[in-house]
A protein has these predicted regions:
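C-terminal amphipathic alpha-helical segment
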Residues: 35, 274-306
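Leucine-rich repeat
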Residues: 2-223
Length: 306
């Protein structure tokens, strides 16, 4: 028996839908009664305001029919945001896939609130989420606090957080399956939250950390034997005391250090194959720290540019 014949008709259709962008999977509900709720079983979910406001791809659940963008665009966008929020509120708790393999959220208008992000992430985690990606960038700059159950999610393999997210790591937590962690310009609950998180990710392979003004991080040790790829960035206005990197398995390293003084210590990268370094100072010292690299890209920032 081949693999396809092992599926029921509905299971096969759901499998096919899972390969479509989620917004297109939703639109199939208008095809027939059989298709009406099939998208509710797709295990990969994505709600993206950027996609929603591309009028040529608008779906009747979210947007009214608009032939051209005019002076009423803002009110249309606001109304559409409310439609999308209501749609998620109604359907996400009822999503019938037993496992939500991935949930991707990207919101930037005032329609979406921090409490929404927290609730929707909590629902995904309760369904054994394997991938979570949240980009939250509202005008009011309120941070979304992640639910506590996230920090004990045994199934989570990929976690990507960006912008107005508050990462408040408890003292006791467990993410035993986490291999990919991207933290870009988020805020941390205290000066030790990021350090606690990195110190207890024993199988982490891919790490992206972008530090920015007001994120509460002052110093950081990246000591992760399993790490293969590291992208580490600091803005020029970071109030930062220093960092230490000890990653014996690392193969790819990207460093963007725009801080005013170099205060880094790179100790152990014997397997490094490629490095991409952007900095404002102490290039000679940085080069001495990555002597084993096979491919090196350098970008010298102007110290006078503010």
């Amino acid at each position: 028996m081949d693999k396809i014949s092992g599926f029921s008709d509905d299971e096969l259709l759901v499998k096919i839908l899972s390969f479509l962008p989620f917004k297109f999977a939703i639109t199939t509900s208008v095809l027939s009664k059989q298709w009406k709720f099939l998208w509710m079983r797709v295990p990969k979910l994505e709600y993206d305001e950027d996609s929603m406001y591309s009028f040529e791809y608008s779906f009747r659940y979210f947007l009214p029919k608009v032939k051209e963008v005019d002076s009423e665009t803002y009110s249309i966008v606001s109304e559409s945001g409310h439609r999308m929020r209501s749609f998620i509120e109604k359907n996400l708790p009822l999503h019938s896939s037993p496992v939500i393999e991935s949930l991707r959220l990207k919101f930037f208008t005032e329609v979406f609130q921090p409490e929404d992000i927290k609730l929707w992430v909590e629902i995904a985690v309760s369904r054994c989420a394997q991938e979570l990606s949240v980009d939250f960038f509202p005008k009011e700059k309120h941070n979304a606090l992640l639910p506590r159950n996230l920090y004990t999610c045994k199934s989570l393999v990929t976690l990507k957080l960006r912008n107005n997210i508050l990462v408040d790591v408890p003292h006791v937590f467990s993410l035993p399956s986490l291999k990919i962690l991207h933290l870009e310009r988020v805020t941390y609950g205290d000066g030790e939250s990021l350090q606690r998180l990195l110190s207890n990710c024993s199988v982490l392979e891919d790490l992206v950390v972008e530090l920015d003004t007001g994120d509460n991080v002052r110093k950081l040790d990246v000591i992760i034997p399993s790490l293969l790829s590291l992208s580490f960035g600091m803005s020029r206005y970071c109030a930062y005391e220093g960092y230490r990197i000890d990653t014996p398995s690392l193969k790819y390293f990207k460093l963007t250090d725009l801080s005013k003084t170099f205060s880094g210590l790179i100790e152990n990268m014997p397997k490094l194959e490629e490095a991409n370094i952007t900095a404002r100072h102490n290039f000679k010292k940085l080069l001495e720290l990555v002597t084993s690299v096979k491919r090196l890209s350098l970008n010298i920032e102007n110290n006078d540019a503010e």
